[in-house]
Amino acid sequence: HKPVSTVLDFFEVEQVTLIGLSLGGCLALRAAAAEPRVERLVAYDVLTNLFDINLRQTNALPRVLLKVLLRLGATRIVNWMIAQVARKSPVVQWGLQQGMHVTGTSSAFEFLQRAKQFQTADVSASIRQDVLLLAGSEDHYVPIEQWHDQIRMLKNARSITARLFTRSESAQNHCQVGNSGL
């Protein structure tokens, strides 16, 4: 939220609509909870928990093992395990590379530890603005459950409009990108 407040201070803005795209949806929700000058908020996509999004790319047993290894600080083993998964999945490879780039981390272990900070459960009840939540019905990265969870967590929002885009609109995927026809 501090960068948003700094920008609003610099430009002497008293009311703003804040729009967050992809991970920015999570960041915009977090900023709105702390910044009363944000009057309206648009989040597409909605990421309630970046750590969970990344771990869901693995099967149940490796997911549990990864959580334990992260708690134990087993950096080399975590990095090796994630490298094996990334080799088989372009989505995991992309998510890992993009995640490390955005968070300024240099390993899978570091990124997963940092990803725990990117969640909305602790701030959602503080959001009092008008909120528009957008999601794709077949998002390859963010599970649709997080969209439903975010709607439920916004207990004090002034208003909530939630829109789920579908394949028939060519907007079913992450950030409402689909297979757009020419």
What are these regions (language model features)?
Residues H1-E12, R30:
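Alpha/beta-hydrolase active-site loop
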Residues L18-G20, G25-P36, L41-A43:
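Short glycine-enriched nucleophile-adjacent loop
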Residues V42-I53:
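Active-site nucleophile loop of the alpha/beta-hydrolase fold
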Residues L61-L96:
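Helix-rich cap/lid subdomain of alpha/beta-hydrolase
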Residues T105-V123:
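Active-site nucleophile elbow and catalytic-triad environment of alpha/beta-hydrolase enzymes
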Residues I127-R128, L133-A135, D139:
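Short beta-strand/loop motif that positions the catalytic acidic residue
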Residues H140-Q146:
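Conserved alpha/beta-hydrolase "acid-adjacent" motif
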Residues R163-G181:
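Catalytic histidine-centered segment of alpha/beta-hydrolase-like enzymes
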